């Protein structure tokens, strides 16, 4: 199982999904943040392929999932997480 990159608490990031879906809005992206005991601290569900998020304080790990919103076909290629610079 591939591992996700380590993220810094309170840092802003951009998640970019690379997939083709039919119909176009047939899938959502979910990112869930967990504390050291495995309890959910926060969840974010997005329709967009590219979105920003902040890694919450107190997070120990996180999980990225795809949720069906009625898609008929899905070709998943990759996703990336990049750190955003603070102003």
Where are these regions (language model features)?
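Extra-cytoplasmic beta-strand recognition segments
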Residues: 1-25
């Amino acid at each position: 199982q591939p591992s996700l990159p380590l993220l810094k608490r309170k840092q802003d990031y951009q998640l970019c999904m690379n997939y083709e879906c039919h119909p176009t809005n047939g899938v959502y992206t979910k990112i869930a943040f967990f504390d050291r005991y495995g309890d959910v601290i926060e969840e974010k569900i997005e329709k967009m392929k590219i979105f920003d998020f902040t890694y919450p304080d107190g997070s120990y790990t996180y999980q990225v999932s795809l949720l069906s919103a009625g898609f008929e076909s899905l070709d998943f290629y990759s996703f990336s997480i990049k750190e955003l610079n603070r102003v």
